From Swiss-Prot:
Entry similarity comment: Belongs to the cytochrome b family.
Primary gene name: MT-CYB
Binding site for heme b b566: H97, H196
Gene Ontology biological process terms from the UniProt entry: mitochondrial electron transport, ubiquinol to cytochrome c
Cofactor: heme b
Pfam families per UniProt: Cytochrom_B_C, Cytochrome_B
Name assigned to this protein: Cytochrome b
InterPro entries for the chain: Cyt_b/b6_C (IPR005798), Cyt_b/b6_C_sf (IPR036150), Cyt_b/b6_N (IPR005797), Cytb/b6-like_sf (IPR027387), Cytochrome_b (IPR030689), Cytochrome_b_C_euk/bac (IPR048260), Cytochrome_b_N_euk/bac (IPR048259), Di-haem_cyt_TM (IPR016174)
Keyword Ion transport assigned: no
Amino acid sequence: MTNIRKTHPLLKILNSSFVDLPAPSNLSSWWNFGSLLGVCLAVQILTGLFLAMHYTADTATAFNSVAHICRDVNYGWLLRYLHANGASMFFICLYLHVGRGLYYGSYTYTETWNVGILLLFTVMATAFMGYVLPWGQMSFWGATVITNLLSAIPYIGTELVQWIWGGFSVDKATLTRFFTFHFLFPFIVAALVIVHLLFLHETGSNNPTGIPSDPDMIPFHPYYTIKDILGFLIMLTALSTLVLFSPDLLGDPDNYTPANPLNTPPHIKPEWYFLFAYAILRSIPNKLGGVLALVLSILILAIVPILHTSKQRSMMFRPLSQCLFWLLVAVLLTLTWIGGQPVEHPYVIIGQTASVLYFMILLILMPLISIMENKLLKW
């Protein structure tokens, strides 16, 4: 008798995606981050659902409702900090996942890559709106500053900002709609994840060598299921350690002060995972230019497949490209550090240099080095 997992209409979809899926035999731990992101999304949706049961999206009570969750709700403090630090874990996994794609040439699967970029934008939008909800000082001023950037759009900018705010400033209407969208977006993310996997399973996974692995495939279960479970345990251990020992390590102390439109914090900055983009935004002294650079800092990923000039897919056997890749990582870490610093010398010039380097590496140096490596192959 045929196994039910191969005949049942629902189970056979799951079977072909997670059990009998042919996978390359040489996938390294860098391929774990896709499944880790799935776990992060599940944790965020579950903790968020329970938090939403106790949260009130009203300027008068939002801050107090978060305090109430932490003090009076059973394990409310755990839910709140799992959700806040879960977002940090989500972005760590996201950036490592994208970095893996860049390093091993996974972006040549353009449909999967483009859906991935769309996912990145959606998750970033969700995280930004979530940061506004506790209605602390940094929530309020972060929302004001970032939404205000849209006023740089010619002709329709000001009207667009007021339309998003639902008034002439960030207020009750803004908080209510941000809560609505923050609740909705994770489900859109979940739908996009299915599309992402659909496109991935059309082509099959890439592998560290970048060479087609059709002759040497192994079933996903048990080999990669057990490997993924190990990844889950390591990540959940790290998350638990963060939540239970230093839950406020990655947060901003200003967010423990209720939002006050009459008092501006000395340094307005977003959560740590947006600091690199924020540094790029700040490094351009023109408002519209800064906004364009901010959007392009992520959107540039969409043209990476077009700029792929190498005859080899992966960077595994391309030492010069590897050096450039790690320089790019160093530049991004520098930008993250600069984003959290005040706008003064020498931080301004460091940020501007790092921003120029970031775009230069991706747009000019990577394609040129790849062409050079192609020539070296002939020698």
